[in-house]
Amino acid sequence: MKQQANLIRAGQVIEHDGRRWTVLKQQIITPGKGGAFIQVEMRDLKTGNKTNERWRTADTVERLMTDNRDYTYSYTDGDNLVLMDGETFEQFLVPAELLGDQAPFLQDNMAVIVDLVEGDPVGIHLPATVTLEIVEADPVVKGQTASSSYKPAKLSNGVKVMVPPFIEAGERIVVRTEDSTYVERAKG
């Protein structure tokens, strides 16, 4: 389906120069002189190579329709994730590299959504937030509680996040998987 270049969004799959690309980032740039254009960072689905492309906002681009399927993560087998279809109980292999920076947040039996183009996996979406335990946190400095400063903490999956000063090691917190940021203390 053809669409204007200014409607491209991160996560979409497009066809350009006879190859399929997944859009990683997009930015509309309006220079002081001349017309606006869109700068797109994208990755080749076959080779994994990244490139930047620049189009005028009125240019058209071929967008491929994706089919979203629900799966449950079972285990990792080498460079692949083994996912299970909840309806048919069939196993499905997906390259682990599709997770990118979100890989540390993948947990056993986690529900994930896989984007497919003609049966080929092109992206994986984790839940928006996960609950993890803090294994290391700097102690609170007296007088620091009045300010809105954050302190570094290490999660059980090895990821480092910035947390409020009242959070201590051993507590469970909710973390946003998209950008590894603290959301709140876990309830219960």
Curated annotation (Swiss-Prot):
Give a GO cellular-component term: cytoplasm
Q: Which InterPro entries match?
A: Elong-fact-P_C (IPR015365), NA-bd_OB-fold (IPR012340), Rib_uL2_dom2 (IPR014722), Transl_elong_fac_P/YeiP (IPR020599), Transl_elong_KOW-like (IPR013185), Transl_elong_P/YeiP_cen (IPR001059), Transl_elong_P/YeiP_CS (IPR013852), Transl_elongation_fac_P (IPR011768)
- Please give the coiled-coil regions recorded for this protein: none
| Entry keywords, A to Z | Cytoplasm, Elongation factor, Protein biosynthesis
- CDD domains in the record: S1_EF-P_repeat_1, S1_EF-P_repeat_2
- Give GO BP annotations, semicolon-separated: peptide biosynthetic process
Q: In which pathway does it act?
A: Protein biosynthesis; polypeptide chain elongation
Q: What family does this chain come from, according to its entry?
A: Belongs to the elongation factor P family.
HAMAP family per the record?
EF_P
- Entry protein name: Elongation factor P
Which gene name does the record give? efp
